[in-house]
Amino acid sequence: MTQRSTKTAFSPWEMVALESFQTPEHTQASQWRRSWRAATTWIMGREASEHQAKEESELRKLSEVALSHWVPAIDWTPAARALSQVTEGYVDAPVVLFISPPHGGHAAVVSHWAQQQGVNCISAPTLNELTEGCLEWVERCGSQRQWVIPALERHFLRHTQGLQGVRELLERALSGRLGQGVIGCDSWTYAYLQHAVGLEGVPVVTLQALEGEQLAHYFAQLAGDGGVRPTVYSSRTGQPILADVSEDSADGERSYKELQRLAAHCRGHLGIAWHYWRERLREPVGNDESGRSQEQSEGQPKEPSKESSKELWLLDALAEAELASDTGDVATLLLHTLLIHGGLEDQALGYVLPFSSHEALNARLALARQGILRCHQGRWQVAPLSYASVRQLLESRNYLVDPL
């Protein structure tokens, strides 16, 4: 595989043209492992299929206070600056698309870019406006020299009327009748619109996929900002998986291999890897119990001590909510529909699915109970820790999948 420039600076913010995007090393092997693990779990049961150096019963979840300390939210501002540099090379292009996978931050990045540039964001149409083919939101683009749409997936429905607006937008923009635009777009929405509407000639950029070494540096800096970094161990191997970012040692190389496994599982996407890191991070049972009791008795949550909370553990990345291999057609089509729309509210399902609202709701409820779906800001979407298995299932059944 071609060596990439990100190796020198370890930056997670390399912005590249879509055709230059490369998944991390061992991505295909990660898919094989996921399939094998699902098969052995089905045959032998979950306990027999897993051998862990540290059992989950010996660990516990971190408090929200501790999580906000060790794993703060991703700051997408550097990505917005990288987008600004890239767009300078497309001064003659009427539209530039920035795409990311689900949970990949495209809306936040483009919103930050708009704020940096002093450009107004175009608000999304309502569900009623989409189903009626309303074009008022397109007209709002035409009245500005520059315009921004942070999340294009909120501006269409896979519905006869629901595609009219985005078709009109692209026709006007590419013909030069609108000002210059920057659009954030879910990678699944992009794949669908490329197929249904056509996006030939539109420059498309994305963040380059990360390798394990880059994830190690990013998470080490995230956890150790302004203080002592924790030692994070793998529950699978018992070995440390975060090395001191100032060291170039054999121990560091071994730790990168473990995070390479996570990078491959997440296809190199920082947003999804961050969710794994936050959701799967644990501390030993009995760690700092007295300190916790004192905090609770005082009724005042405190920031965890970096000195007393140095030992943390990461549960196996592959042990997420997994789709059964015999997932039915209704559930599979629902998952694909949610992905190409970047998530949908319940009342929108009847407009975009070829079966009754009752069937759609039953499938949605079942997937939510399994942990495959989650509700975020009123919309049902594929949960971050289930995304890899959902994508693999859809690809295996020859559904249209995203390019990332």
Describe the role of every protein-language-model region.
Residues 1-140:
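Extended, compositionally biased accessory segments flanking or bridging domains
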Residues 122-166, 183-184:
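Conserved P-loop NTPase "ATPase switch" module shared by AAA+ and STAND
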Residues 153-197, 204-208, 212-215:
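Sensor-1/coupling segment of RecA-like P-loop NTPase cores
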Residues 204-255, 264-265:
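Conserved small helical "lid"/interfacial subdomain of P-loop NTPases
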Residues 251-278:
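The conserved phosphate-sensing helix
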Residues 279-359:
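Winged-helix-like regulatory helical subdomains adjacent to P-loop NTPase cores
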Residues 354-370, 375:
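Short amphipathic alpha-helical interaction segments
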Residues 387-404:
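Short, amphipathic alpha-helical interaction segments positioned at domain boundaries
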